[in-house]
A protein has these predicted regions:
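EAL-family c-di-GMP phosphodiesterase catalytic domain
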Residues: 10-11, 60, 112-119, 138-152, ...
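Catalytic-site/binding-pocket detector for metal-dependent nucleotidyl cyclases
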Residues: 8, 78-79
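Active-site core of bacterial EAL-family cyclic-dinucleotide phosphodiesterase domains
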Residues: 7-10, 14-73, 110, 171, ...
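Conserved small/polar residues in nucleotide/adenosyl-binding loops
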Residues: 1-5
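Surface-exposed amphipathic alpha-helices with a cationic face
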Residues: 95-99, 129-130, 156-164, 213-220, ...
């Protein structure tokens, strides 16, 4: 067996073992799953205004697995539907707790294409709203740009129902796909999240910065808000803030962390 084939075989075995662990975790009350929270900052006040809920999984054999590795497995197997429902329940419950301290706090929850097209995610959101008593403005649903470009009939129904309910939509990873402003005007998301890859290029190159500036101007002209993702240093922040986004997030403000650490670092101190 050549080295390339051997590496592919190792990857196949690893993927298969992770898939088995994921199934076992879902079957046993989502054992080894966790939800991390990354702060979202208001650009004008530099205060915490919300968080993005992020799914995490720790393998008993391999340790913490990157979401880029385990999320696709969840989607391929359909396990993203129960796992996503579990994460939504956790995140909305924690949002309710934080709002007792910070009344305007909002929770952003990622919904995958599989969830939007194959599950009763709208009913799940509605049920959790009733259970937690959260107002509509407390929850933001995040969909990626690539998922929206591939939307099918069921996803269109999902977006229609989302609007009907009055739940805010955020378009995540903007700049990584086709970035068609026509569909932006149709969907009218409240927030456009500029991807880290776009941000990094803009900081390093003046032409890229000019392009991002034009994007931001067009987004604002469509009456949408902007969240710049991936700010990792004060230098980046000083340059990016000139684009006048409403919100920002990134390691400069705080890395994703567990709920107790998040509350200790970002909520109780406020």
């Amino acid at each position: 067996m050549c080295i390339r084939d051997r590496d592919k075989y190792k990857q196949f075995i690893r993927r298969r073992e992770i898939r088995v662990e994921l199934q076992n975790a879902v079957d046993h009350n989502f054992k080894n799953f966790d939800v991390y929270y990354q702060p979202i900052i208001d650009i004008h006040t530099r205060n915490l205004i919300g968080a993005e809920a992020l799914m995490r999984f720790t393998s008993e054999k391999f340790g913490m697995i990157s979401p880029a590795e385990f999320i696709p497995i969840l989607e391929e197997t359909g396990l993203i539907i129960p796992a996503g429902r579990w994460m939504m329940k956790e995140a909305m419950g924690k949002c309710s707790e934080i709002r007792k301290i910070l009344s305007g706090f909002r929770m952003s929850i990622n919904i995958s294409q599989v969830q939007a097209s194959k599950s009763d995610v709208i009913q799940d959101i509605s049920a959790e709203m009733k259970r937690t008593g959260l107002p509509l403005e407390a929850v933001i649903v995040e969909l990626t740009e690539s998922d929206l470009l591939e939307q099918n009939i069921n996803e269109k129904h999902f977006l229609t129902e989302l609007k009907r309910m009055g739940i805010s939509l955020a378009l995540d990873d903007f700049g990584t796909g086709y970035s068609n402003f026509h569909y932006l005007s149709e969907l009218k998301p409240e927030i456009i999240k500029i991807d880290r890859s776009f941000t990094a290029k803009a900081v390093a190159d003046e032409q890229e910065y000019y392009l991002l500036n034009q994007f931001c101007t067009m987004i604002h002209n469509l009456d949408m808000k902007i969240c710049i993702e991936g700010i990792e240093s004060a230098q980046e922040w000083l340059k990016i803030r000139k684009l006048c986004p409403e919100f920002t997030q990134g390691y400069f403000w705080g890395k994703p962390c567990g709920y107790e650490e998040f509350v200790r670092k970002f909520v109780q101190e406020k």
